[in-house]
Design a protein with these regions (language model features):
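Short cysteine-rich clusters marking metal-coordination/redox-active sites
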Residues: 47-50, 64
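Short, flexible, mixed-charge glycine/proline-rich loop motifs
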Residues: 34-43, 53-58
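Non-catalytic interaction/regulatory segments
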Residues: 635-636, 642-735
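Conserved nucleotide-binding/hydrolysis modules and their immediate coupling elements
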Residues: 499-599
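Cysteine-rich micro-motifs
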Residues: 57-72
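Terminal appendage regions of diverse proteins
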Residues: 395, 458-469, 474, 480-481, ...
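Extended, domain-scale alpha-helical bundle/helix-rich regions
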Residues: 391-397, 429-509
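Structured aminoacyl-transfer and RNA-binding surfaces used for tRNA recognition/handling
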Residues: 74-382, 392-405, 440, 709
Length: 906
């Protein structure tokens, strides 16, 4: 294989990464050699240990600088000219690259809203990748640039705290240049590696002979983009990986990319660790946090023991070690202590390190709108949170995760000031999760005990099932089964399937030989003329249309074409189809006149605009973690699914509705500009992607002042006042972490309010003569809801429920009198509100119910004196059956009950 501007066909074997590595290695002068290597005296060698090619300026070096070919040489012996903490390292990096023509841009969210296939940001280049109808494009705010991108990765969670280097969150200091050679500011391999050397050698002071560059290749899974890459190592640690996106596969042909991209991922944490040389990276990465945690937990480890342990901690990588027990013994032997001593000495410290990492990960995720749940990316956040809580409980550490998160936020404020903004909201989310975990633990004790007593084999499948169905972690099982060995890849398997998602496309198959339909629906046109381009069964394809097609969760318009009813409108790709009742009356090429149903369009626009207002109001009332998780806009009602960590209370629902209607009364103009995607992201932020990533270069923005701004293709009002009013019907928790709000707007809201008033009148009917005038004449929907809550029923069931309770209340009075109790007269309830009346009725109902049971019990006990004392079984059956008979009918003869008892008792 060789790659030139001229296409060259690949024949014979299938392209693989291994094949590319071999071919790139043969032509290393073309793909890996750069000017800096010549200038600094670097030569290419093959590692005698691993066989990989590397570049060094040390003529005596015969082994590369990767581990395990060499041990870490910087531990307790850093070779940099200074020690920089987490923030200082970024400032050093930022200053150098800004001086060399790069723009420093703020980090992007760790919860990815712009890629349809990923939940979390896992690399800095991801910030600038946009998927357009299956094609990858780049959108960037500057060129070249650097970014301190926080990334979340969960496959190695079981190693965090153990190996001394693994993390669930880290900063990838991204160095990127786009579009070489056509874009201004872009550069490629020579300048990239020159900057690499100048920073590491010149700014950090790493001797040139200690910098080793190792050849590799990077490729997209489908080889849509690939190229050589150069990994920079020093003393066993990889510091940076420089990727040169240079080529692409095209069928059986290969060619240069039209524009090349520099994708350099600097390991920020590794640079910090390397310059400080602490035995475990965690002691240098989290500033004062690990010191505070150790002191608070009383964790002390002999420095000599820990130094020896840290040198071999990497061998406990649970993702690579097959026999972890054997590996632990080997480590203990190397350190010179028993396995028991190792466990008692090191494991509490490992827990402290893991908690420091996990709390920071949760802080970033929750600041950016992520919440723990049992679905999607939230699943991984719950795994992290519960692992931290399990460590706190296991070692009785007494830590407060939110307090630790605040320490992180304070320490990182110079880099990430936004972490200060969501601490209160994080506290609410974490406390709700702690309550859920506590309830889970109460329920699981019996389950685990039963499994252990049966000597159940806890294999991978069972452990996964127990976690996913009941939230039972291996750490919990170990409390009952101390010898349990957790599968080395347990958390990797759990989190892997929740790290990405597959999005289904909308609209079905593409229609061949038909141009995209011109859309008139956004112009508020309700009549139009068009030409029929194609007829498919009962569906007409027009060159232009004012009908809105079902999409984005919104129902379609209806109306007529030449007076014939249009019953459905839908999309296939960019083509819109109109289903008509009499397609035989139309022919291709015919001119038709279309009329859109104005009333339906108005109601749909009101409901859709209400969706945006409700979303904004929910975010303001509940917190910034609220994001749209789905929506549906119909004529009869709308629904909005939002991310939230608990059920929404009636009070919160009322506040949301009140805020929505306040915005309606204010008459906010609804702007609908079409904005280039990059500019929209910069101007409005990633909140515009409420409905998920949009595969278009230009976004239609629905802007309701500063209250809510979203990218949306639906039909909307022109001013919030046109929505008229919104009535929220109900809130339902549809899955863990997602709450569904159902509501109506405009005339439908008026109709719903009238229906509630009618319900109020029905509720009052059985109260006539029992309540004061204030209850009969007063009307409050909020008070009606409170009355329904008294009986734990939906509002719609309040009239029949109240009638039933009043009836039973009266029946109890008659029965009490029949069993010799005092006669209870009907009374007038003096409460001035319906909810208070409901509370009194329910309270009196319970009192009468108890009094009646006591009287019946007393009667039955008297009757039992007639039964033989030496037949306890018969007496027991009699008591239960007689109570039941008399509660049903106070006149049930004793003989009838006795007859049934004798049959049962034999």
């Amino acid at each position: 294989l060789s790659f030139y501007k001229k296409k060259r066909k690949i024949s014979g074997t299938m392209l693989t990464k291994d094949l590319l590595q071999k071919e790139f290695g043969k032509n290393w002068q073309k793909y890996y050699q750069v000017g800096m290597f010549k200038d600094k005296g670097y030569e290419r060698k093959i590692c005698k240990s691993c066989g990989r090619a590397f570049w060094t300026c040390n003529p005596e070096r015969e082994i590369c600088a990767d581990s395990p070919c060499v041990e870490y040489g910087f531990i307790n012996n850093p070779i940099t000219k200074g020690k920089w903490d987490y923030v200082e390292t970024w400032k050093l990096f930022e200053k150098f690259f800004e001086k060399n023509g790069h723009t420093s841009v703020p980090r992007y969210p760790v919860v990815d809203r712009w890629r349809p296939d990923l939940y979390f940001t896992i690399a800095s280049i991801q910030d600038f990748q946009r998927v357009d109808n299956g094609n990858m494009n780049f959108v960037y705010p500057a060129n070249p640039l650097i970014v301190p991108q926080v990334c979340l990765r969960f496959p190695d969670i079981q190693n965090v705290g153990i190996t001394g280097k693994h993390l669930t969150s880290f900063v990838m200091s991204g160095q990127h240049a786009f579009g070489h050679p056509k874009q201004k500011g872009a550069y490629f391999k020579d300048r990239c590696l020159k900057l690499n050397f100048e920073f590491l050698n010149g700014e950090m002071g790493i001797p040139a002979e200690e910098l080793v560059y190792q050849e590799d290749i990077w490729a997209m899974p489908d080889f849509s983009a690939f190229g050589p890459c150069m990994e920079t190592f020093s003393q066993g640690l990889e510091l940076v990986n420089s990727v040169f996106m240079q080529f692409q596969k095209e069928g059986d042909w290969f060619r240069d990319l039209d524009m090349r991209v520099i994708d350099v991922g600097w390991g920020h944490e590794r640079l910090v660790w390397f310059s400080n040389g602490t035995p475990a990276s965690y002691d240098s990465l989290f500033g004062p946090i690990t010191g505070k945690l150790k002191k608070k937990a009383g964790v002390k480890v002999d420095p000599t023991i820990f130094d020896r342990y840290s040198k071999v901690a990497g061998s406990l990588d649970l993702g690579e070690v097959k026999d972890i027990a054997k590996a632990k013994k080997k480590v203990a032997d190397y350190v010179g202590i028993s396995q028991e001593e190792l466990r008692e000495t090191i494991e509490p410290l490992q827990a402290v390190y893991a908690i420091a990492d996990h709390s920071r990960t949760l802080l970033f995720a929750m600041t950016d709108g992520g919440i723990p749940s049992n679905v999607g990316g939230g699943y991984n956040l719950r795994v992290v949170l519960r692992r931290a809580l399990s460590f706190i409980d296991k070692y009785d550490l007494g830590f407060d995760l939110v307090e630790i998160a605040k320490w992180h936020a304070d320490y990182l404020k110079p880099m990430f000031p936004e972490l200060q903004t969501e601490l209160d909201n994080m506290a609410k989310i974490v406390n709700a999760e702690k309550d859920k975990f506590k309830e889970t633990r109460k329920k699981i004790k019996a389950s685990i005990t039963a499994l252990v007593e049966k000597d159940t084999k806890f294999d991978d499948a069972l452990l996964t099932q127990l976690y996913e169905s009941q939230g039972i972690t291996p750490e919990e099982i170990r409390k009952f089964k101390p010898d349990l060995e957790m599968p080395s890849d347990f958390y990797e398997q759990l989190t892997e399937k929740h790290s990405s998602l597959t999005e289904g496309g909308e609209g079905g198959k593409m229609i061949a030989n038909v141009c995209a339909t011109e859309k008139l629906c956004y112009l508020d046109e309700f009549q139009f003329d068009a030409t029929i381009l194609k007829i498919m069964d009962d569906n007409l394809v027009l060159d232009r249309t004012a009908f809105y097609a079902t999409s984005g969760g919104q129902e379609h318009d209806t109306g007529t074409l030449d007076g014939i009813k249009v019953s459905d409108v839908f999309k296939q790709g960019e083509v819109i189809l109109h289903r008509v009742e009499e397609s035989s009356k139309f022919k291709v090429g015919q001119k038709v006149h279309g009329v859109v149903d104005r009333a339906r369009r108005k109601q749909l626009a009101q409901n859709h605009s209400a969706v945006h207002l409700v979303n904004g109001a929910a975010r303001e009332i509940l917190g910034n973690h609220v994001w749209q998780a789905g929506s549906e806009v119909r004529v009869d009602k709308a629904r909005l699914d939002i991310t939230h960590y608990s059920a929404i209370t009636k009070e919160q629902l009322k506040k949301i509705e009140d805020l929505v209607n306040e915005k309606i009364r204010r008459g906010i103009p609804i702007e609908k500009p079409v904005v280039e995607r990059g500019r929209a992201e910069q101007e409005y932020g990633f909140r515009v992607y409420q409905g998920g990533a949009i595969p278009q270069k230009d976004l239609r923005i629905i802007k309701m002042g500063d209250f809510d701004v979203e990218a949306c293709g639906g039909t909307h009002c022109n001013n919030t006042r046109e929505i008229d009013q919104v009535k929220i019907l109900r809130a339902t928790k549809i899955q863990d972490g997602v709450v569904r709000l159902e509501f109506v707007a405009g005339d439908k809201a008026n109709a719903a309010k009238e229906a509630t008033k009618e319900l109020h009148e029905k509720t009052l009917k059985p109260l006539s003569g029992l309540v004061c005038e204030a209850v009969l004449t007063g009307y409050s929907e909020e008070d009606m809801n409170k009355a329904a809550e008294v009986f734990s029923v939906p509002l719609v069931q309040l009239p029949i429920t109240l009638e039933r309770f009043i009836g039973e209340w009266g029946d109890y009075g008659d029965k009490i009198k029949a069993f010799g109790g005092e006669a209870l007269e009907s009374r007038v309830f003096d409460a001035d509100r319906l909810s208070k009346v409901a509370e009194t009725i329910f309270s009196e109902w319970k009192k009468r119910q108890k009094l009646l049971k006591d009287l019946i019990s007393k009667r039955v006990q008297e009757e039992m004196k007639q039964l033989p004392a030496d037949q306890p079984k018969m007496r027991g059956i009699f008591f239960g059956m007689r109570m039941k008979d008399l509660e049903s009918d106070s006149k049930t003869p004793l003989e009838k009950t006795l007859e049934k008892v004798k049959k049962i008792a034999g």
